[in-house]
From Swiss-Prot:
InterPro entries: Asp/Glu-ADT_sf_sub_c (IPR036113), GatC (IPR003837)
Any one Pfam family match given in the protein's UniProt record, by short name: GatC
Protein name: Aspartyl/glutamyl-tRNA(Asn/Gln) amidotransferase subunit C
Record's keyword terms, sorted: ATP-binding, Ligase, Nucleotide-binding, Protein biosynthesis
Entry GO MF terms: asparaginyl-tRNA synthase (glutamine-hydrolyzing) activity; ATP binding; glutaminyl-tRNA synthase (glutamine-hydrolyzing) activity
UniProt subunit comment: Heterotrimer of A, B and C subunits.
HAMAP family reported in the protein's UniProt record: GatC
């Protein structure tokens, strides 16, 4: 599948990526190759593969939720770059 220059520019605009004319040509070739590969994969017969197939045979890999040792407040703050009133002090995330 060969993408047009306009299609590549449209995708770049949606992704908020500025591309030079040279980059558009490179991306056009690369994206077209990726889409060709996807088209090839779509032709693979997977009718005998169960939808939830996996190879490890494991049914659950989660450990039991067990309460363990906890750090004291002093231990937790020991390497904090900045602290105030016994709490981590971080730069504001939201502006008022």
């Amino acid at each position: 599948m060969s993408l047009s220059e306009a299609q590549v520019r449209h995708v770049a605009r949606l992704a908020r990526i500025a591309l030079s004319d040279e980059e558009v040509n490179v991306m056009r070739a690369q994206l077209s190759a990726i889409l060709d590969y996807i088209a090839m994969l779509q032709e693979v017969d997977v009718s005998n593969v169960p939808p939830t197939a996996q190879v490890t045979g494991l049914t659950t890999v989660w450990r039991p939720d067990v309460v363990g040792e906890m750090l004291t407040q002093e231990q937790a703050l020991a390497n904090a770059p900045d602290q105030q009133d016994g709490m981590f002090r971080v730069r504001a995330v939201f502006e008022e």
